[in-house]
Every structure is written in C-alpha cells, then in structure tokens.
C-alpha cells in the first residue's frame, strides 16, 4: 500500500490532470522551487505498476521525481559549451521519452534506462549543434573521476551496447569477428567477451566489468573504444 501522504499527492495529480491543469511542463529550471524528492523504491514500484494502464498521474510523478537524475547527468556536460539550463531542458525530454517507453517487465531499473535516454538525448543535441559550430571533442577532459583519472566526454556518454553490436555486425559476420578477437591480447579479449557476451555468457555493463577486473569504469570505457578501433582495422584486413 502507498503511504498516505504519497497517496494523497497521487490523487491530487489525478485531479489536476482531469481538470486539464497539470501538464508535462517543468517549472523547476531556473526557478525558485526546489526539485521534488526522489521516489522511494516502494513508491516507484506502485507507480510503475500503474504505468501500463495509461495512468497519467503515475506518469507525471515518475517524470517529476526523477528530475534530479536529469540535473546530475546534465552537469557532466557543462564543459561542452552548452548552457546548463539548456542541457537540463534537453535531458528532461530524454527523461519523458524514457518514462513513455519504459517496460516494467524487463529486468532493468527505471533509473538505469532513464540515464541512457537522458544521455542519448543530450548527445544527439551535441551532434546536431556541431553541424553549425566547431566540433566538440569526445576526447576533451571534462573532470577527474574518483580514481584520479581524467573523465572524458566519451567516458561520460558511455558506450551504447546496441549501437556497437549493430555496427560490428554490419561490418562482418560472427566468424570474422571471432577471428579478429584472436588478434587481441588476453586482457582485451576478456573485456570484449564480458561486455558483449561473445563467449556465450550474458552481456555485462562497463561497471560490472570494471568491478570484476578491479579497475575504474572510465578506464574500461576508454580501453573498450581503443579495442573496437583495433577490431575495425582487423576487419579491414580480412574483408
């Protein structure tokens, strides 16, 4: 059962939506209002169960209570030359898309899925923006991570498993991929096998691989990109 206070908030949202007063507009950016607190695990679970039924109050609450995630991710892109308020606005579009397309039946947390959508939305904006401006360097240091390593824009964006997998499959078939993998050293091969399940196991996130190997996630991200460049060179030799 929802706690009484949160249940009353939920009912109030339903009333506002029914009256046409509540919309998807976000008033927190640049305003005096504080961001709403994040949902508890129990509250999020209740709202996610209502989402497939088209419950607009649940949808609105899931969006508003995850705005802190948008701000957190947007701040990682502050050194790209885009105004922070614009980044938050763009990231919020990604959050709305995430809530609209989230499938509660899949074994993935909303925060994980939303983070990817928010980052992708900002990345797409950066790419569009680059057509009219000087190119943003994906190897430009943005900050320093917890281990003292430089945090690059490419590290922050992470690596979209689907994009890389489709890119590789579009270039060569699995036979050539496995042949190319044998040109890597043991550590590089292990990282690729863990990340993309190439040895028959499950695909793992960069964080999972970093924890398993005892190194930082940003280092895994950087190393992964170098490995993929090497693989592409091997592909070019074979095709």
Swiss-Prot record:
CDD domains: Sigma70_r4. Residues 206-225 bind DNA. Residues 1-27 form a propeptide. Keywords: DNA-binding, Sigma factor, Sporulation, Transcription, Transcription regulation. One of its GO terms (biological process) is DNA-templated transcription initiation. Gene3D superfamilies: 1.20.120.1810, Winged helix-like DNA-binding domain superfamily/Winged helix DNA-binding domain. Proteolytically cleaved in the N-terminus probably by a SpoIIGA homolog to yield the active peptide. A motif (Polymerase core binding) lies at residues 86-99. GO terms for molecular function: DNA binding; sigma factor activity. InterPro entries: Cro/C1-type_HTH (IPR001387), RNA_pol_sigma-70_dom (IPR014284), RNA_pol_sigma-E (IPR014200), RNA_pol_sigma70 (IPR000943), RNA_pol_sigma70_r2 (IPR007627), RNA_pol_sigma70_r4 (IPR007630), RNA_pol_sigma_r2 (IPR013325), RNA_pol_sigma_r3/r4-like (IPR013324). PANTHER family: RNA POLYMERASE SIGMA FACTOR RPOH (PTHR30376:SF3), SIGMA FACTOR RPOH HEAT SHOCK RELATED (PTHR30376). Sigma factors are initiation factors that promote the attachment of RNA polymerase to specific initiation sites and are then released. This sigma factor directs the transcription of crystal protein genes, a sporulation-regulated event. Belongs to the sigma-70 factor family. This is RNA polymerase sigma-35 factor. It comes from Bacillus thuringiensis subsp. kurstaki.
């Amino acid at each position: 059962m929802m706690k009484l206070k949160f249940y009353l908030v939920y009912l109030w949202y339903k009333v506002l939506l029914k009256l046409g007063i509540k919309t998807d507009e976000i008033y927190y950016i640049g305003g005096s209002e504080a961001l709403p607190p994040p949902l508890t695990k129990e509250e999020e679970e209740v709202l996610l169960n209502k989402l497939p039924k088209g419950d607009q109050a649940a949808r609105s609450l899931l969006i508003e209570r995850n705005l802190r995630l948008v701000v957190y991710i947007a701040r990682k892109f502050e050194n790209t030359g885009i105004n922070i308020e614009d980044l938050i606005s763009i990231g919020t579009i990604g959050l709305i898309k995430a809530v609209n397309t989230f499938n509660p039946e899949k074994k993935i947390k909303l925060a994980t899925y939303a983070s990817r959508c928010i980052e992708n939305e900002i990345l797409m904006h950066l790419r569009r923006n680059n057509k009219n401006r000087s190119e943003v360097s994906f190897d430009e240091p943005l900050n320093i991570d917890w281990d003292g390593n430089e945090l690059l824009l490419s590290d922050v964006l992470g690596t979209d498993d689907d994009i890389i997998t489709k890119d590789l499959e579009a270039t060569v078939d699995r036979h050539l991929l496995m042949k190319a993998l044998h040109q890597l050293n043991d550590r590089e091969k292990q990282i690729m096998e863990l990340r993309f399940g190439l040895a028959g196991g499950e695909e793992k996130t960069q964080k999972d691989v970093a924890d398993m190997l005892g190194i930082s996630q940003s280092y895994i991200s950087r190393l992964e990109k170098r490995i993929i460049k090497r693989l592409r060179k091997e592909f070019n030799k074979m095709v």
